[in-house]
Swiss-Prot record:
Keywords: Cell inner membrane, Cell membrane, Membrane, NAD, Quinone, Translocase, Transmembrane, Transmembrane helix, Ubiquinone. PANTHER family: NADH DEHYDROGENASE SUBUNIT 1, NADH-UBIQUINONE OXIDOREDUCTASE CHAIN 1. This is NADH-quinone oxidoreductase subunit H 2. It is a multi-pass membrane protein. NDH-1 is composed of 14 different subunits. Subunits NuoA, H, J, K, L, M, N constitute the membrane sector of the complex. Coiled coil: none annotated. NDH-1 shuttles electrons from NADH, via FMN and iron-sulfur (Fe-S) centers, to quinones in the respiratory chain. The immediate electron acceptor for the enzyme in this species is believed to be ubiquinone. Couples the redox reaction to proton translocation (for every two electrons transferred, four hydrogen ions are translocated across the cytoplasmic membrane), and thus conserves the redox energy in a proton gradient. This subunit may bind ubiquinone. Its EC number is 7.1.1.-.
Length: 318
């Protein structure tokens, strides 16, 4: 792909992702309203569809006033660090054969690295705010990411072993014409989904911004577009986790009749709907229960799944 085509595709992808994140906020609020038997946004545009545009314009016009005594460098850097790595992560996602900005040999590891950077944004924002509630939220985020990133990587290694590659396109190609890896790796898929919820900081793994005891957690002192960038990063993280889950376990772009990018988009949308459904259905656990589950239950299961898969892969190769 020439440099001009890469630049053009990158621009189109950027605009599509920003639009998808905005539409997702509207879809989430409408779906939550339906699940909770109440009205969602229904004033701006048909079915409230333009509510996300109105919210964006409102945040653009709001003042962004740092608190007194804030570390301005950390305070300003944190929102950008929450959003931009998520955009970079989509640079290695293969939406269809040859429809990828950069099909890296270590594409899966690159996406994991981008997801892990979000915890730096949360800790920097908490530290820069000089706020006790924000600092507690940042510390929770750091401990949670350390616990859940450990088995996030282990849970996807089964797919890497079966495909024999970290490249996104190779993993999808290994599932074409055969069984999707969600059927061969059901435990790995379940563990990866749970870890993905934690990586995206979604309920029930959103204790770093728990409103009941931390006001707004690490975002307590943010407003205006800085606040919006944190939310943009969160929704892009959901889409990135859904895209990675689709690639690893749902065959990527594979599907009958419809074009590959359409199948990929439908699968990502379905996974994103499950994220919203879980937000409406599940309570928030205690912090000690959350961390204990990661270290005592999920991590041993991920190791067991990896060992069994490695044994099967070696047996097939022999």
């Amino acid at each position: 792909m020439s440099v001009l085509l890469i630049a053009l595709f990158s621009l189109i992808l950027l605009l599509a992702l920003l639009g998808a994140a905005g539409v997702f906020t509207w879809g989430e609020r409408r779906l939550l309203g339906f699940l909770q038997e109440r009205l969602g946004p229904n004033r701006v545009g048909p079915f409230g569809f333009l509510q996300w545009v109105a919210d964006t314009l409102k945040l653009l016009t709001k003042e962004d006033a740092p608190p007194a005594g804030a570390d301005l460098a950390a305070y300003r850097l944190a929102p950008a660090l929450a959003a931009f790595p998520m955009l970079a992560g989509f640079g290695v996602v293969a939406f269809a054969p040859r429809l990828v900005i950069s099909d890296l040999d270590v594409g899966v590891l690159f996406v994991m690295g981008m997801l892990a950077l979000t915890v730096w944004a949360l800790v920097l924002g908490a530290w820069g705010s000089r706020n006790r509630y924000a600092m507690l939220g940042g510390l929770r985020a750091a401990a949670q990411m350390l616990a859940y990133e450990s088995f996030l990587g282990l849970s996807l290694m089964g797919c890497v072993l079966l495909a024999g590659s970290f490249r996104m396109g190779d993993i999808v190609a290994a599932q074409e014409g055969g069984l999707w890896f969600i059927l061969l790796q059901p435990l790995g898929a379940a563990l990866f989904f749970l870890a993905g919820l934690a990586a995206a900081h979604r309920l029930p793994f959103d204790l770093q911004e728990s409103e009941q005891d931390l006001v707004a957690g690490f975002m307590t002192e943010y407003s205006g577009m800085s606040f919006a960038l944190f939310f943009l990063g969160e929704y892009l993280a959901i889409l990135l986790v859904a895209a990675l889950f689709t690639t690893l376990f749902l065959g990527g772009w594979a599907g009958p009749i419809l074009p590959g990018p359409v199948w990929f988009g439908l699968k990502v949308a379905a996974i994103s709907v499950v994220f919203v459904w879980l937000r409406a259905a599940l309570p928030r656990p205690r912090y000690d229960q959350l961390i204990s589950f990661a270290w005592k239950v999920a991590l041993p299961l991920a190791l067991l799944n990896l060992l069994v898969t490695a044994w099967i892969a070696v047996g097939r190769a022999a």
